[in-house]
């Protein structure tokens, strides 16, 4: 009985010592904007796309219009500002002047001002290392050809985005034309890291093409942070190619709080190959 009394007194003490504690915690800032775009060392009009976030993969993102968008870089002690202009026929797409050309190894900042908010992203423009075009396609059992994605020049390449632009529209009408088309564009990524070879395809369908096809192979060399963005993006999605419309919470970004996506600065190289029988 005495033991029970001790237990009862102990419980009463615990109850009397209860105190309501208001925990302080930081909420993630609201996601206001998705940024998708890059500049290169080509002299051309470069595109930056601004949209509102969506919650479902198949939702169509709403373009963000009326933003003030600029690209900044240092030149000596001065900061040079290059304002972008919103495309009249494509709301939410902002263009540099057609003469704008990035410089290798220079850091570039994207500055966005919209409805009282300001967002910033920074990336370094990497040099694009030359690549070999031999053996980039192989003949299939059906007599047609397909891209040789496992070719060593790609699997062992530096971090880059690659595009195969295939065109055999100049060949006779009797030539192979699936779905009535004689063109295709394929994308893949070489994203080397410590634990994987980092070769990612942008789809699972094999595209066949005939001898005589013209292949324009484009390479965009990317920074380590751009590669990290793509790794996390590919890890979070069932990647089939296309525009990144939905961003998960843990996807890497170089945008300041309130925005996601990526602003990239890339070195660019391209070469043309004609498929020989």
Regions found by a protein language model. Give the residues of each.
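A sequence/structural signal for flexible, mid-protein segments enriched
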Residues: 18-277
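Sec-dependent signal peptide recognition
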Residues: 2-9
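C-terminal motif of bacterial Sec signal peptides marking the signal peptidase cleavage site
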Residues: 13-16
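Enrichment for repetitive, rod-forming helical segments
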Residues: 9-10, 192
């Amino acid at each position: 009985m005495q033991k029970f009394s001790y237990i009862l007194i102990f419980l009463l003490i615990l109850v009397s010592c209860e105190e309501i504690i208001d925990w302080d915690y930081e909420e993630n800032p609201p996601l206001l904007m998705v940024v998708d775009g890059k500049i290169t060392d080509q002299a051309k009009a470069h595109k930056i796309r601004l949209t509102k976030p969506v919650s479902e993969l198949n939702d169509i993102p709403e373009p963000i219009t009326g933003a003030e968008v600029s690209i900044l870089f240092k030149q000596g002690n001065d900061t040079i500002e290059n304002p972008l202009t919103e495309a009249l026929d494509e709301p939410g797409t902002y263009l540099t002047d057609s003469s704008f050309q990035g410089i290798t190894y220079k850091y570039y900042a994207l500055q966005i001002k919209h409805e009282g908010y300001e967002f910033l992203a920074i990336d370094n423009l990497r040099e694009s290392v030359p690549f070999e075009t031999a053996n980039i396609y192989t003949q299939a059992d059906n007599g047609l050809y397909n891209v040789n994605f496992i070719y060593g020049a790609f699997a062992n390449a530096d971090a880059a985005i690659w595009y195969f632009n295939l065109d055999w529209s100049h060949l006779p009408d009797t030539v192979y034309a699936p779905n009535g088309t004689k063109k295709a564009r394929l994308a893949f990524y070489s994203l080397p890291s410590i634990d994987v070879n980092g070769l990612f395809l942008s789809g699972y369908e094999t595209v066949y093409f005939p001898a005589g096809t013209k292949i324009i192979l484009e390479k965009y060399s990317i920074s380590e942070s751009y590669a990290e963005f793509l790794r996390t993006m590919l890890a979070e999605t069932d990647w089939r190619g296309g525009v990144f419309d939905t961003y998960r919470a843990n996807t890497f970004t170089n945008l300041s709080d309130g925005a996601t996506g990526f602003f990239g600065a890339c070195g660019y190289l391209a070469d043309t190959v004609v498929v020989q029988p």
